[in-house]
Amino acid sequence: MKRIVIFADEPDWHCRRLLKAFAQRQAAASIVSLRKCGFSLGGDGSGLLIPGFERSLPDVALVRNIPSGSFEQVTFRLSLLHALRELGIPVVNDARAIERCVDKSMTSFLLHRAGIPTPATFVVEDQERAASWRRTEPADVVAKPLFGAQGRGLSRIAPGEPTPDPGGDPLRGVLYLQRYVGRARDWQDYRVFCVGEVAAAAMVRRGASWVTNVARGGVCEPAPCTGRLAELAAAAAAAVGAGYCGVDLIEDAERGFLVLEVNSMPAWKGLQSVAEIDLADRIAHHVLGL
């Protein structure tokens, strides 16, 4: 029987679905917080401290979330995931994929490098350079926190409005600016859930404003997970090396679907409410096949 560690802070809805999915596939899964893990070096053994896995390491690790904390704490927790990979334990998603997705600038770079269409993006620390770039942009731009999620900290800036000062919250020293793609009303975008670099399910998110995240009141509707939408989402997952992820896309009148972001630790409760497949079971199937 395979032993799975699910790294999460608490047994939320997602974890309960995953525990059930693994049990139905005759695998033993347990939830462990990365806060409780560590290193013990200098003696015998792997050098890793994972509660419940003192005698032997798990067969596979699945990361639901990494707790927030100081820069040192988050770096340490990522180091634990790096160490598991160095020891030959499959990690979904591993620290490399998480780092690539948490940092929006690296996500955008990897999408660009892979030839995946995205909105024009400019990332610098210097406010004057950002203002100079904005003067070449004919329309609104969106300023995003480099490490933001769930629609928090976004601001839409019209031509002629001042470029924000990157100091302080929410930008914290870095200006990540992206050309606004959307409508004057009837705002919507798409979330595609990928597992094993395959597009598994999709939804349309309709918002009361241009920020359509479910956490910001967006309404979920099913969408066909086919064609160009599925193709681009799968390509984005491959570009960042994610074993499972949520890919956000928007439709441009001229360029078609564009990839906005990739989330390496996605929630899927909203998508599950309109999906025909069990997404937790799809994740379990992928993890147990590694």
Language-model features, listed with the residues they occupy:
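Extreme N-terminal starter segment of soluble prokaryotic enzymes
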Residues: 1-5
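Conserved N-proximal alpha/beta basic substrate-recognition cap immediately N-terminal to
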Residues: 9-120
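Structural motif
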Residues: 62-64, 142, 176
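Rossmann-like NAD(P)H-binding beta-loop-alpha module
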Residues: 114-138
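Protein kinase-like catalytic core scaffold
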Residues: 141, 200-201, 245, 258-261
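Phosphate-binding site of ATP-dependent enzymes
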Residues: 150-237
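A long amphipathic alpha-helix within ATP-dependent nucleotide-binding catalytic cores
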Residues: 210-259, 280-290
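Glycine-rich phosphate/pyrophosphate-binding beta-alpha loops
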Residues: 263-275
